């Protein structure tokens, strides 16, 4: 596989596991293409045409060294210049097993600058859980603007420049990976049908990545509520969609009948608002959840004979081997 083919596989898996129906994603891309066609000629030159084809613009191919048959990839949750240097070091010291591609999860380069563009996904998910779309979009717009301003001053291309100088291909896969773990956890919870909040924690602890995280002090934890509380209606609104949404959404979710939310991570401001709304918050874990999603994708690469070198917080669990 080439670097681009690996990236395309990730995007397709992201679409297949998106909480939104495929037709909704296709309509979104069609709408962007329509807006592009109406732009003046000068503005078209500045427009990122990838936005018309890639529904997850917080993910991208940042540098492609042109390797036609990727055999070995180094994969981490966060990739910076240090990890790129490690990839070059490993390649230099073992030329027969060079690192052909480095894969990051969290956004870098242009994907980081565009992080807020994928957050519209959250409004669609909130609507599925009973929040009127006008309220979901209104609250999300405020938060999207905040995130856009927040990432604006960051040195987005630091690690991308390093990849170019070292001549090592670099991509990142963010929302597609988050979609994978969101669907995976939802399937697990739907199967187990927990009655009490404590049952959710026990269900999550049956997943290898969460068990390992617990050993390391960062396993699933209850942020609000009690293990003895009944779960009510469960929502997975804080696993995919870029980053945290608007803290004011919990009141609306409670009014929509949501009793428990399962998320990756949560700020103190969001926790307090959820507590006011009497919603149980189960935090599965950030890096461990990212590892689950990444592992589900990496299993597909492993099936194609690509060797995986985990780094930077990735807990590698191969479900391909477990099926044997």
What are these regions (language model features)?
Residues 1-324:
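Active-site catalytic microenvironments in core metabolic enzymes, especially phosphate/sugar-handling
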């Amino acid at each position: 596989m080439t670097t681009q083919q690996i990236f395309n596989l990730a995007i397709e898996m992201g679409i297949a596991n998106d909480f939104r129906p495929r037709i909704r994603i296709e309509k979104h891309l069609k709408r962007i293409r329509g807006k592009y066609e109406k732009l003046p000629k000068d503005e078209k030159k500045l427009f990122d045409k990838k936005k018309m084809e890639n529904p997850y613009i917080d993910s991208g191919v940042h540098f492609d060294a042109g390797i036609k048959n990727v055999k070995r990839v180094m994969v981490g949750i966060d990739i910076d210049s240090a990890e790129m240097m490690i990839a070059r070091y490993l390649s230099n010291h073992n030329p027969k097993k060079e690192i052909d591609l480095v894969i990051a999860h969290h956004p870098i380069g242009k994907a980081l600058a565009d992080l807020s563009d994928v957050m519209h996904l959250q409004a669609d998910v909130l609507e599925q859980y009973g929040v009127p779309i006008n309220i979901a979009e209104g609250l999300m717009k405020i938060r999207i603007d905040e995130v856009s301003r927040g990432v604006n001053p960051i040195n987005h291309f630091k690690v991308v420049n390093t990849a170019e100088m070292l001549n090592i291909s670099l991509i990142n896969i963010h929302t597609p990976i988050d979609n994978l773990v969101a669907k995976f956890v939802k399937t697990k919870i739907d199967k187990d049908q927990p009655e009490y909040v404590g049952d959710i924690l026990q269900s999550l602890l049956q997943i290898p990545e969460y068990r390992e995280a617990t050993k390391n002090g960062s396993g699933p934890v209850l942020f609000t509520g009690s293990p003895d509380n009944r779960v009510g209606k469960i929502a997975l609104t804080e696993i995919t969609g870029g980053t945290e949404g608007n803290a004011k959404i919990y009141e609306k979710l409670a009014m929509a009948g949501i009793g428990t939310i399962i998320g990756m991570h949560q700020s103190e401001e969001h926790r307090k608002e959820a507590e006011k709304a009497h919603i149980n918050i189960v935090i599965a874990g950030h890096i461990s959840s990212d590892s689950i999603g990444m592992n589900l994708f990496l299993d597909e690469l492993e099936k194609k004979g690509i060797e995986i070198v985990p780094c930077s917080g990735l807990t590698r669990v191969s479900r391909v081997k477990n099926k044997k």
